[in-house]
Every structure is written in structure tokens, then in C-alpha cells.
A protein has these predicted regions:
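Flexible phosphate-sensing "switch/lid" loops adjacent to ATP/NTP-binding sites
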Residues: 1-330, 337-353, 360-361, 368-374, ...
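A generic structural signal for well-ordered coil/turn residues at beta-strand boundaries
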Residues: 5, 209, 236, 294, ...
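Active-site proximal loops enriched in glycine and acidic residues that flank catalytic Cys/His/Asp
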Residues: 13, 43, 217, 244, ...
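Cysteine-nucleophile active-site neighborhood
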Residues: 19-22, 26-30, 34-36, 347-442, ...
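Short beta-alpha connecting loops at secondary-structure transitions
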Residues: 59-67, 246-250, 356, 377-383, ...
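Acidic/polar loop patches that form or flank catalytic/metal-binding clefts of enzymes
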Residues: 274-277, 383-384, 403-409, 460, ...
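C-terminal and late-domain segments of enzyme folds
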Residues: 438, 442, 446-542
Length: 542
């Protein structure tokens, strides 16, 4: 269906953070897609950083990279995984970007001597960014998730901008979905609605009346409680949704559909709901995730393992690849700083597969190299991503080629054997933010390689986030000793994929395959890696 002008859905959160606004936003998008509407989702983040590219993963979780090279919030990963929509720079807006743009305009004299203020200048820029996606004329519905919690000082300009937009666009062209928490007090055995009432009251104080409430809860909500929330929050009873904890986030669209959330949204937007959604493929996927035939143990070796959100896309890629292989991937997060030669067997010996995760810097690097060595010498299926691939190269150089001091110039600029080196175009760059090799680039695979077999083609395009690369001066040494470069950029020759052909499954990628794995198209490398781990597990039993 193609509308002449898009409709807008705004998603806010109250009571507490981390309730799942991104999951609800993605679920609404998936349901509207199933009804024939073209949808996109954007995230407004209230922090003053320009983007999360320089944020510590412990502060923010994963930095998700889009096809066009934007470093964005991890919620954009949810959007793409749920819907297979390709996002871009325009899908993630921060307070930092807004203020930077307004200040740049002021310096250029575009405000003609006016006093630059939050209202109207900041709010006007926010509204412009919200409506930027509409200029593509590709979407029927634009969903905008407002980061943070209603009542936060940082979110106020965004809330005011939404109020103005709803007024300007008209009541039938926008809908406001508010996600809140219904806490359970174990001492009294009660579910409490007061925090939700106060959250809605805070919204009302800022001029916004929610159209739909989604109530996060650990326990089922009674019809009476939902009627109470509807009455005191001034929301239609059929627009109060229960979002109870479920075994997998991919079940949330199905839970929302059973409560007719998509029908309520379409009604609020004055859109027809004639096409019944076909969610059979999603239901089949969820059934596989919830009812695996087998379990497989795979280690994720990294230095941010205390916060799994730092590797969110990798984790979700394994869930999707597990479903394809009718198994559950049990991820074991192993801190690379705590791995050495004396304990690597204890930590990784029972694993059916080992993934060495991406990262930056010297901390934990020797533990990652030790994990690579264990996977290579014990013939355990291995996948190295970005720095993980570079660690595979370093390990091979040290222990097979005999270059004992081989490393990356990131770790030791004076090394005699820089098998990983700073990219030529990066050598004059000093700024940190947004200056890496980012976004999608083409890659040509060697026919017959494990990577080409996994993809089913030799021409691929994958997303990147790095400054360092394989040093091609050493390529002949590596290939003559058994590590092959089986993927390269067709324009520059930059090595993108390495393999050890006589190993059961040993693949390293300079790019990030996890960024392109979705429910509808689980990434072929993860699917092949999990299949190899299962095969290796079966061989050990024989």
C-alpha cells in the first residue's frame, strides 16, 4: 500500500529504562509490514555524543553499523533483525547531532541575528530530522522511538517536538504508544498501577496524551487491572496491551498481534486493516527457537563479556542460526583477560565452537590469541570477527610461520613483523569519531572456499568497522604454510576473509557478518559455523 503522505507513530517509555521500547517499536513495524504497509523506524537518543562510536560498550552496549556506515544505537539492530529493513544515518538522531547542526547554522548566520534557543530552534531541528525519512517517499508509516524515560531532563526537547508535530500533523496522522512497567510487590502479592499512572501524568504535563499503553509485566494482568489503567490514564480499554516476559523477543510481535495491537494502531491512524497479516514464517521461527532438538556449546571470547549487550548482534545471530540448524546455541561468555596457556583447556575444552569477538586495544589481546591457538590446534570450529580475524593471523604468524614477535601495529607500532597494519588511508587521521572504515563494501570470495560454500556465491557485500588490515606483504608466507586469503575487496585487494583449508572449519572475517543477520535471512556464515560445530560434536561421539 502506498500513502500520499506517511503516518507517524511515536514510542515513549516511562517508570524505568530498558523496558524494551526498541522491541515494541520493531514489533509494531513487523505487524504493519505483514498488513502490507511499508515501514521504517528511527531512534532519537538524548545523549550529547554525536554517535555511540566512541562510547565504551559498558556505557552503551553494542555500536551497530548500518549499510551506509553510520555508527548507531543497538536498537537499530533490533529494527533490522525483526523487519529486514535497511536503516541509515537518518534512522538514528542524537542530541549531539541536533545541537551540532543548530550551532553550525548559527555560525553561518542562518538565524539572521536571532537568539538561538531550545524552542524554536532545537525543536525545529528535531522535527526536521523526524520528517527527513518522509522525503524518500518510500514509507507509509514512520515509527520514532524516543530514548530515555519520560521525565528525564535530557528527553524534554524531544517530547516537546513530538507534541508540536502531533498538533501540526493532526490527530489522525499520528499515534503515541507509551511503554511502562507494572511492578509486582512480592510482600503484598500485588501488581501496582500507580507508577504507570504517574508516568502518564508526566506525559500529560508535557502536552501528550498516549493513545496506546503497553504494560511490561512479569505476571499476567487481570481484565480489571487493565480497565483500571485505561480509566485513570484516559486510554481506550482495547488500547491497553500486556507485554509479559516471553522466552524469546521474537515472540513479542505474535503476543501483540493476539491482543490486536496492529488493528488498534491502524484505527488510531485512520488506516484500513483489510489485509490479514501472514505471520506463519515468524511463528515457525519462534517454534524452532522454543523447541530445539539439540543444544550446542559455543564460546564467545571477548573483553566485554560481563555485559552481553556489548555483543548483541552476535548473540542474536546465534539464535537465528540455531533455529536454522534445529538447535539451541548455548553461548558461554569467556573473558579474554582471564585466559592464558595454563587454563585455556579448562575454559574452552568442552566447547563445540569458538568465536573470538571484535574489539579494540591491547587489553585481553593475548587471551584472544591463546583462544585462537586452542581452536586451531584442537581442530575446533572457529569464527573470528574483525579483531578476532586479526588475532587468528597473529597466532598463525607466531606459531606456524615462526615470527614470535608478530602482532598488530595497534598493539606494538615498533614490531618487527607487523602482520596487521594500519590502513594507508587511516595514517593521516587523528580524530576518533566516525573516521574508521565504516559501512558496506564488496568482497570477492574464492570459489570452493568454506566462505563461498556458506554464502552460495562468490560476490558479497558486508559491513565494516575497522582501521587496521591484513598486511599483504606477508600473504605469500601465510598461503605457503596453510592459511589462505579467500576473500578480498575487488577494488583495493584488502584481505577480507582468511581460512585454513585443512581445518574442519576455521574462518576469520575482517567484516562484521552479525550486522546483516535477520530473522528472515539468518547470516550464512553463522549458519555454517553452527552446522560445523554440530558436526564436530557428532564426530567426537563416534
Amino acid at each position: 500500500m502506498k500513502l500520499s503522505k506517511p503516518k507517524y507513530i511515536f514510542v515513549t517509555g516511562g517508570v524505568a529504562s530498558s523496558l524494551g521500547k526498541g522491541i515494541i517499536s520493531a514489533s509494531i513495524a513487523r505487524l504493519l509490514q505483514a498488513r502490507g504497509y511499508s515501514v521504517t523506524i528511527q531512534k532519537l537518543d538524548p545523549y550529547i555524543n554525536i554517535d555511540p562510536g566512541t562510547l565504551n560498550p559498558y556505557e552503551h552496549g553494542e555500536c551497530y553499523v548500518t549499510e551506509d556506515g553510520a555508527e548507531t544505537d543497538l536498537d537499530l539492530g533490533h529494527y533490522e533483525r525483526f523487519t529486514s529493513i535497511t536503516t541509515s544515518h537518518a534512522n538514528n538522531v542524537t542530541t549531539g547531532k541536533i545541537y551540532q547542526c543548530v550551532i553550525d547554522k548559527e555560525r553561518k548566520g542562518e538565524y539572521l541575528g536571532k537568539t538561538v534557543q531550545v524552542i524554536p530552534h532545537i525543536t525545529d531541528e528535531i522535527k526536521r530530522r523526524i520528517q527527513l525519512l518522509a522525503q524518500r517517499k518510500e514509507y507509509d508509516v514512520i515509527i520514532t522511538e524516543i530514548g530515555g524515560t519520560v521525565g528525564d531532563i535530557e528527553s524534554l526537547p524531544f517530547i516537546e517536538s513530538v507534541r508540536q508535530l502531533r498538533y501540526q500533523l493532526g490527530a489522525r496522522n499520528t499515534a503515541l504508544v507509551h511503554l511502562t512497567l507494572i511492578p509486582y510487590l512480592a510482600a503484598s502479592g500485588e501488581l501496582k498501577t500507580k507508577p504507570t499512572q504517574h508516568s502518564v501524568k508526566t506525559l500529560l504535563e508535557n502536552g501528550l496524551q498516549p493513545d496506546i499503553l503497553v504494560l511490561r509485566t512479569e505476571h499476567p494482568l487481570s481484565a480489571e487491572l487493565r480497565r483500571k489503567v485505561a480509566l485513570f490514564c484516559n486510554v481506550d480499554a482495547n488500547a491497553v496491551m500486556e507485554s509479559i516476559d516471553v522466552p524469546t523477543i521474537y515472540e513479542v510481535p505474535l503476543v501483540m498481534h493476539r491482543q490486536h495491537l496492529d488493528e488498534v494502531v491502524l484505527s488510531k491512524l485512520d488506516l484500513p486493516s483489510e489485509q490479514e497479516p501472514d505471520l506463519s514464517s515468524l511463528q515457525a521461527f519462534v517454534d524452532k527457537v522454543k523447541n530445539p532438538k539439540r543444544t550446542i556449546d559455543i564460546a564467545l571470547v571477548g573483553k566485554y563479556t560481563e555485559l552481553p549487550d556489548a555483543y548483541k548482534s552476535i548473540c542474536e545471530s546465534f539464535i537465528q542460526a540455531g533455529a536454522v540448524n534445529d538447535c539451541k546455541v548455548k553461548l558461554h561468555y569467556v573473558n579474554s583477560e582471564k585466559i592464558d596457556a595454563s587454563n585455556v583447556g579448562e575454559k574452552l575444552g568442552k566447547m563445540a565452537g569458538i568465536l573470538v569477538a571484535p574489539g579494540f586495544g591491547n587489553r585481553g589481546i593475548e587471551g584472544k590469541i591463546e583462544a585462537v591457538h586452542f581452536a586451531r590446534t584442537h581442530r575446533i570450529p572457529f569464527l573470528g570477527i574483525c579483531l578476532g580475524m586479526q588475532c587468528a593471523v597473529i597466532e598463525f604468524a607466531r606459531n606456524v610461520l615462526g615470527f614470535k614477535d608478530a602482532t598488530s601495529t595497534e598493539m606494538d607500532p615498533a614490531t618487527k613483523h607487523p602482520v596487521i597494519d594500519l590502513m594507508e588511508e587511516q595514517k593521516g587521521i587523528t580524530a576518533k569519531g566516525g573516521t574508521m572504515r565504516l559501512g558496506a563494501y564488496p568482497c570477492s570470495l574464492v570459489p570452493g572456499s568454506k566462505a563461498a560454500q556458506a554464502y552460495g556465491t562468490t560476490q558479497i557485500q558486508e559491513r565494516h568497522r575497522h582501521r587496521y588490515e591484513f598486511n599483504s606483504e606477508y600473504l605469500k608466507d601465510f598461503e605457503s604454510h596453510g592459511m589462505k586469503a579467500v576473500g578480498a575487496n575487488p577494488d583495493t585487494g584488502l584481505v577480507e576473509v582468511v581460512e585454513i583449508p585443512d581445518h574442519p572449519w576455521f574462518v576469520g572475517t575482517q567484516y562484521h557478518p552479525e550486522y546483516k543477520s535477520t530473522v528472515q535471512r539468518p547470516h550464512p556464515l553463522f549458519v555454517a559455523f553452527v552446522a560445523a560445530a554440530l558436526a564436530g560434536k557428532d564426530d567426537k561421539k563416534k
